[in-house]
Swiss-Prot record:
Family named by the database record: Belongs to the UPF0166 family.
Recorded superkingdom: Archaea
Cross-referenced Pfam families: DUF190
Origin organism lineage: Archaea, Methanobacteriati, Methanobacteriota, Methanomada group, Methanococci
Database matches in InterPro entries: N-reg_PII-like_a/b (IPR011322), N-reg_PII/ATP_PRibTrfase_C (IPR015867), UPF0166 (IPR003793)
Protein name in the entry: UPF0166 protein MJ1524
């Protein structure tokens, strides 16, 4: 068993950083910084301080919630946080929680 951290980043799918979709830019940062792995989830509905986001078949564009999730040791998560803050600024929410990894190739 390894003590680790879960990093979750909540965005909207249309959020951009320097012309690139923010979730794609963040995934590049996580990979470049050696985070063990990450997954992007697309929600079907959500709300927060920036309003309600939901799928509407009659609209051509949608701005649904997107969650980026990764698990790694605390040292690696802390190392990447300043880079994430720089990209996300006021466009999202970052949550970090403790977890235990019981099996994982990169931790053995």
């Amino acid at each position: 068993m390894i003590k680790a951290k879960i990093l979750k980043i909540y965005l909207r799918e249309g959020d951009k950083f320097e012309g690139e979709l923010m979730y794609k830019h963040i995934m590049k940062i996580l990979k470049r910084e050696g985070i063990s792995g990450a997954t992007v989830y697309k929600g079907i509905c959500g709300y927060g301080v920036r309003g309600v986001a939901e799928f509407d078949i009659f609209r051509l564009s949608v701005n649904l919630p997107v969650i980026i999730e990764c698990v790694d040791i605390e040292e690696n998560i802390n190392r990447v946080l300043p880079k994430l803050y720089e990209v996300i600024k006021n466009n999202g929410l970052i949550i970090i929680t403790d977890c235990h990894v019981y099996k994982g190739e990169t931790y053995e």
